[in-house]
Amino acid sequence: MGGIDQDNFSNISWQSDRLGAGSSAAHQHGGQESEQPTHNQAEPEPNYTSMIVHGMGLGDEVLECNVSSPLKENDGTKDAFVSYLVTTHTTFADFQKPDASVRRRFTDFVFLFKTLSREYPASAVPPLPDKQRMEYVRGDRFGNDFTSRRAYSLRRFLARCALHPVLRRSAILHTFLESPDWNATMRSRASRSVSMSGTSSGESGNAHYGGGSAGGGSTGGGNSLANSVFDNFADTFINAFTKVHKPDRRFIEVREKSDKLDEDLAHVEKVVARVSRRETDMEADHKDLAEQFQKLIVLEPGVEGPVRAFAASVEDTAQGLRGLREATEQDYLGSLRDLAAYSGALKNLLKAREQKQLDFEQLTEYLNKSSAERDVLASGGYSSGGALAGAGGFIRSKIEDVRGVDHEQSRRERLRKLELRIEELTVEVERAKKTSELFDEEVIREVSDFERIKRIELKRQFGSLAQSHTDFYDATIDVWEKYVKEMEKEGAVAA
């Protein structure tokens, strides 16, 4: 983990201050829910975000979130699902109460994630735990182990959002945390998104600058949508084989450090997974040892008291090992995987930034080519058929001769179209440059936020893991000291 602690990005002048943009609308809040969970799960620590300190662009507002108590609902039907208790403590003014408690299912978290990703494209929105898991294939996605691990992951998702200077002020996040009528919010936002996508589909073709002129006839919504999808696919396919001409060294270093972080996390994950398997084996061995000593009581009734006490102590140790294994596997091991996924979200943001720069460079190259072509036409190069004309100009000239076109008039018409194209391209280049520069600044701030959130999360996870080990060994010492005292009282152990 030494490589992780060295990710300080000291050679990049990043600013962690961020203006708190966006206002949140007030929402109605009903009574708090208090369902009884069906699983005996170790409660995740609710004060995960209490490590926030002032001076990091977060403001004075407190936002602490916790996810716990998975509950299987509609049991016995095909529509069964698991809901999670989401509790929030906050000092935000737009919350109706400082403490809120609601139940949300995983699809609610998915809707929140997609909405945040759509509304904040320049932010590295923390990812959700992967839904494509073997538990869905084996059918044990309602098991205690799976739901507990998911509760920890969902808690980390909300904690990251609460630590983000922009996402923590999002209106949709606040609604998610306290609204008693969340389903109505999802329906209204879904219908609004569909209507907005329908109205903007006809304009998407004009937003993408192409070499040809705009068509005069109008097309239907379905054709416009199909053309837009095809254009986006074509752009993605072409840009996959296009590299940035002037890569920014700052973001190259960020990607290299992210790759190193992923490598370190993968290595630590393997080690922790091996430790978890050893703890499972030790738990099974202790249980087996306790069972064998229970059988010994039948063979040696004279030592029933000491043997029974010893077997009970071994059984208590096995229970402690089980709690330690659950803390290691469900919380800490899951946090490593979640952090690797969060690093992937940052890499996706770097790819989006690179795409903005690539758009600017391609538009600039297209503008330069159009300007050079205009200069050649203005000097009469194509019309004279000289060396400047080239093969294309020569062929065009011959075709115009066959068609009986006036060369001078054709040259002036092409020159006029080039002037219009250059004028449009100049505006687009300036716009793309400004967009790329602004996106660069946002990504720099996002990297700084990612580093801060990562440090807080790792500190909390290390502290939680150390505390679970301390609790286990304290409990084990108490168990065996109690056993020794009992044996001393019975005279089975020499004082």
Swiss-Prot record:
Q: Which Pfam families does the entry mention?
A: PX
Q: Where would one find the signal peptide in this protein?
A: none
Protein species of origin: Pyricularia oryzae (strain 70-15 / ATCC MYA-4617 / FGSC 8958) (Rice blast fungus)
From the Swiss-Prot or TrEMBL record, give the protein name.
Sorting nexin-4
A GO term (biological process) for this protein? autophagy of mitochondrion
State the domain notes. Answer: The PX domain binds phosphatidylinositol 3-phosphate which is necessary for peripheral membrane localization to the perivacuolar punctate structures.
**Segments of skewed composition (Low complexity):** 20-31, 193-207
Annotated residues for binding of a 1,2-diacyl-sn-glycero-3-phospho-(1D-myo-inositol-3-phosphate): 105, 107, 131, 150
